[in-house]
Amino acid sequence: MVRMRWQAFLDAVRERGEYPTAHEAERAARTVLALLGAHLVGEERAELAARLPETFAMILLNPLQAAEPLDPERFVRATAAWIDGASAETAKWDVSAVLSVVADAAGEDLMSRVLLQLPPGYELLFGRPRPD
């Protein structure tokens, strides 16, 4: 699998999040990936990082610390706390925009393994349907 290019990643986040500027898309991506990195370990985190642009890979590999795994709702609230002026609603938009691009970069096999490391309910944030 090839590493996604910086501009392609940012353009995809900007389009999905409907951000007016690349700066806003980058801010959302940095925050969401820093929080996501705290929830992943080992091979899956390293493999996912290898598919992201280098700057974002480093953020994923050097995450914000989380005392405990956050369920999806708390993950969104934590994102809102890190983004100036964000509400839970806008943060959910930010999280979904970034994580759906991450899921595309990851591919199905890796995404399945990543979701196994996360508390239940993250599928929708990654733009994936819930398993039956």
Language-model-derived ranges and their functions:
Residues 2-20, 70-86:
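Short, flexible domain-boundary/linker segments around small modular repeats
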Residues 4-5, 24-28, 90-94, 105:
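Short acidic alpha-helix initiation/capping motifs at coil-to-helix transition points
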Residues 20-46:
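N-terminal interaction modules that seed assembly of large macromolecular complexes
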Residues 29-36, 48, 95-102, 114:
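Short, structured motif recognition centered on aromatic/hydrophobic residues
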Residues 38-71, 106-132:
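Extended intrinsically disordered, low-complexity coil regions enriched in Ser, Thr, Gly, Ala
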